[in-house]
């Protein structure tokens, strides 16, 4: 992902304000509610029968935190996203058979959640930088797909 020095600094500053415990679950929960067909990959998560159930589900929150922790790792390795996400790409492709389009959808939900929580600090310029990163991460996660 090609980012200017200003974009990298803005991302680092704003990412320091992010609470992965809270925002990861919210982003994943929104994915599962807005795109209900994505729920089929989460059969073991229990009750996903309503928006309230999804958003309050502790397994959704825990997995969302894992997702954001991985995203945080990606922010530290912007010059090597494919390498950083290689094992996760393999897992999601070969074992879990996740549609790679879901990575793009989740990235969009993450951007929405960041905008909601960061408010005026999430300027159009910051959004543009985050969009580049989530697109890069989605591409890296889809890399092992044939």
Curated annotation (Swiss-Prot):
Heme b binds at residues 63, 92. The modification S-nitrosocysteine is found at residue 93. GO terms for molecular function: haptoglobin binding; heme binding; hemoglobin alpha binding; metal ion binding; organic acid binding; oxygen binding; oxygen carrier activity; peroxidase activity. Disulfide bonds: none annotated. Transmembrane segments: none annotated. Gene3D superfamilies: Globins. Residues 2-146 form the Globin domain. The modification Phosphoserine is found at residue 44. Involved in oxygen transport from the lung to the various peripheral tissues. This is Hemoglobin subunit beta. It comes from Sciurus carolinensis (Eastern gray squirrel). The lineage of its organism: Eukaryota, Metazoa, Chordata, Craniata, Vertebrata.
């Amino acid at each position: 992902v090609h980012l200017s020095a200003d974009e990298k600094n803005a991302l680092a500053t704003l990412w320091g304000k992010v609470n992965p415990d809270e925002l990861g679950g919210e982003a994943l929960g929104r994915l599962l509610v807005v795109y209900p067909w994505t729920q089929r990959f989460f059969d073991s998560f229990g009750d996903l029968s309503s928006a309230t159930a999804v958003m309050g589900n502790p397994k959704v929150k825990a997995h969302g935190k894992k997702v954001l922790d991985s995203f945080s790792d990606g922010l530290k390795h912007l010059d090597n996203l494919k390498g950083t996400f290689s094992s996760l790409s393999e897992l999601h492709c070969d074992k879990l058979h996740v549609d790679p389009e879901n990575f793009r959808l989740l990235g969009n939900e993450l951007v929405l959640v960041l905008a909601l929580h960061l408010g005026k600090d999430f300027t159009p310029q910051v959004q543009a930088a985050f969009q580049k990163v989530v697109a890069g991460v989605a591409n890296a996660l889809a890399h092992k797909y044939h």
